[in-house]
Amino acid sequence: MPVFTASFQCVTLFGQPASAADAQPLLQGQRPFLHLHARRRRPCGPMLISKSPPYPASEETREWEADGQHEHTDELRETTTTMIDGIRTALRSIGEGEISISAYDTSLVALLKRLDGGDGPQFPSTIDWIVQNQLPDGSWGDASFFMMGDRIMSTLACVVALKSWNIHTDKCERGLLFIQENMWRLAHEEEDWMLVGFEIALPSLLDMAKDLDLDIPYDEPALKAIYAERERKLAKIPRDVLHSMPTTLLHSLEGMVDLDWEKLLKLRCLDGSFHCSPASTATAFQQTGDQKCFEYLDGIVKKFNGGVPCIYPLDVYERLWAVDRLTRLGISRHFTSEIEDCLDYIFRNWTPDGLAHTKNCPVKDIDDTAMGFRLLRLYGYQVDPCVLKKFEKDGKFFCLHGESNPSSVTPMYNTYRASQLKFPGDDGVLGRAEVFCRSFLQDRRGSNRMKDKWAIAKDIPGEVEYAMDYPWKASLPRIETRLYLDQYGGSGDVWIGKVLHRMTLFCNDLYLKAAKADFSNFQKECRVELNGLRRWYLRSNLEKFGGTDPQTTLMTSYFLASANIFEANRAAERLGWARVALLADAVSSHFRRIGGPKNSTSNLEELISLVPFDDAYSGSLREAWKQWLMAWTAKESSQESIEGDTAILLVRAIEIFGGRHVLTGQRPDLWEYSQLEQLTSSICCKLSRRVLAQENGESTEKVEEIDQQVDLEMQELTRRVLQGCSAINRLTRETFLHVVKSFCYVAYCSPETIDSHIDKVIFQDVI
């Protein structure tokens, strides 16, 4: 078989002299490879050398191959499968929203009298729920998270309901005692965690308590401040707007007076509710006897077996957050069809005005809209970013129209994440949103004001920190997942509405346990694969061919591959990525050491034959190496970076080992594919220049100019990957994105950061 050489001469590789006459015939089974010339100025991208101490030695990782470990791994996989099946069952039965019961809303529904004129409540099961759910200290409210506002609101409402029907005096007395002893604590509540409409609803409850002669410290200074705030807010409410168009004010009608119910009834949601609030709807029914309001209340009382939530339904919100949590926890691949069903539902209900928590609510918000935009765009749906203009005013972005408080952390965090998914030609609103949200979050982060008015989650500061420090273009899936496993609170996360509530479908411990087990399986596979990769590396004697820290280069190369391609059935792809990266680094190190391929005198077949490949793909792999090595020679004289060609080599190798590679001449989608290659090469070359510019102390303006160029090309690559040619396999398109994002990650991260991520992702056990 003829041997290819870029200069039509034999080359010495790594100081192993050989001439054409000295060339030995290939042994049976040995595959011939290419000898080419290339030059790379400095390592960049996946070849960046880290300077940390060595990672665990091969003896330490061999324990993962012991029979007992394999048995443990099998048990863990079986347990993981069981949990995954449980999550899948829940997703397939997803409906209008699974949410905890609100004692406050249940009590207001319990006040409704029988429709037939008889004595007693229309919904006696609500009374049963109240009686059965008093807490040991005499209060009602969230049992696991103590917030005084939540406990006072819930307890006072339950006492009012029981006293109104003159039943369960003992429970009323215990509830009153709790209120009497704790009302003063309202003055010390966390301002950022104020319940929705608290200053409107609590005075209304207190007025009802007065009418029932309940012994409550009405002159408590904390209550005087709340009454004053109520008057201030009610005075600001434009009555004509309240009665003429849907607003968030409809969510708190139970706290308002002098309402024109005939006008308000025209503003009901299609399901008969007022802004999906049982308490507000119960008040409306009490005042009007409207049949649609009754049907809404009757339906939720039956669904929740006597108790009612503080808001319902939440069909859009629940689907969006479930998909987001599953994705960030790294287990979304197990629920492909279920996620598709969820997002199809979201897309069907997408509107030019955005999204609300439910499809029938006319009052849209930026939180649901931004999350919906981001997920739909990520999964290939066509959505217009101009929808975010609905939440922009005077250069600022807000969550809800007419909100009285400044924007809060989580809505701006979700909008910031969404704003990074830009395509060429998109309206400038995404750029403006990114700038505003980043500034807002930086300000909150810098002043340590990270409490959110909508959620009390385990580690919101950590989530925001990751998003700020690692933009989407440089965020690798396994890094995000490993960190999110420590940030996700599971069943401990609480949401703030009129009262505290919990979203049990996507905030639960089953998600967390399944994700941790899944990640533990991944870590064990990584350690086994790394052990094998080390042995291959030592057996191949690659260390002698150069490199500042070959062992760390090995670790970094494998880490970048596994941080992107982590599925158990794709081991060949990540190992192919790692081996090709190591070989390319060895060739490049050697050529840099000897002054370029022009000073080489022998062939490269010994080195290239170290890459194992199936005969079916040998031609493709040879061609990939040939083109990369030719690029060395072509770019040697021009001093151009070889990083773009290295990125293409990695893409082609991954596709070859994944069994998806098609020879160039056989591609029906040649133009689209070549565009992906050109963008990938160009971006990675620019990232190399960025690294060099920083190392050489060039101006900040120069680095920013390169960043802008990278961002523009990244937008085009993102569009082509997420919504590009359907003739190109989705996995193939994603391969380009994986490789480019790995180059971005290395370009933007210090070696110390990369080392810490390697340790965290692969070696620190998930607890």
From Swiss-Prot:
Q: What happens when the gene is disrupted?
A: No visible phenotype under normal growth conditions. Mutant plants exhibit increased susceptibility to the rice blast fungus Magnaporthe grisea, and reduced capacity to inhibit germination and growth of lowland weeds in paddy soil, possibly due to decreased levels of momilactones and oryzalexin S.
| Miscellaneous note of the record | Phytoalexins are diterpenoid secondary metabolites involved in the defense mechanism of the plant and produced in response to attack (by a pathogen, elicitor or UV irradiation).
Q: What class of enzyme is it?
A: isomerase
Q: Which InterPro entries match?
A: Isoprenoid_synthase_dom_sf (IPR008949), Terpene_synth_N (IPR001906), Terpene_synth_N_sf (IPR036965), Terpene_synthase-like (IPR050148), Terpenoid_cyclase/PrenylTrfase (IPR008930)
Query: Which cofactor names does the annotation list?
Result: Mg(2+)
Q: Where does Mg(2+) bind?
A: 365, 367
Per the entry, what induces it? Induced by UV irradiation. Induced by methyl jasmonate.
The residues the record assigns to binding substrate are: 233, 453
Which keywords does UniProt give here? Chloroplast, Isomerase, Magnesium, Metal-binding, Plant defense, Plastid, Transit peptide
Q: Which GO terms describe its cellular component?
A: chloroplast
Entry GO MF terms: magnesium ion binding; syn-copalyl diphosphate synthase activity; terpene synthase activity
Q: Does the keyword Zinc apply?
A: no
Segments of this protein annotated with the region Disordered: 45-74
Stretch forming the transit peptide:
1-47
What reactions does this protein catalyze?
(2E,6E,10E)-geranylgeranyl diphosphate = 9alpha-copalyl diphosphate
Q: What does this protein do?
A: Catalyzes the conversion of geranylgeranyl diphosphate to the phytoalexin precursor syn-copalyl diphosphate. Required for the biosynthesis of momilactones that exude from roots and act as allelochemicals against lowland weeds in paddy soil.
What EC number(s) does the entry state?
Answer: 5.5.1.14
| Locations listed in the record | Plastid, Chloroplast
Looking up PANTHER family in the UniProt record yields:
ENT-COPALYL DIPHOSPHATE SYNTHASE, CHLOROPLASTIC
Its UniProt domain note says: The Asp-Xaa-Asp-Asp (DXDD) motif is important for the catalytic activity, presumably through binding to Mg(2+).
What is the scientific name of the source organism?
A: Oryza sativa subsp. japonica (Rice)
Q: Gene name?
A: CPS4
Similarity comment: family membership: Belongs to the terpene synthase family.
Q: Show the Gene3D superfamilies listed in the entry.
A: 1.50.10.160, Farnesyl Diphosphate Synthase, Terpene synthase, N-terminal domain
Question: Cross-referenced SUPFAM superfamilies, in alphabetical order?
Answer: Terpenoid cyclases/Protein prenyltransferases, Terpenoid synthases
List this protein's GO terms for biological process. Answer: defense response; gibberellin biosynthetic process
- Renumbered to this chain, the Basic and acidic residues biased-composition regions fall at 59-74
Q: What is this protein called?
A: Syn-copalyl diphosphate synthase, chloroplastic
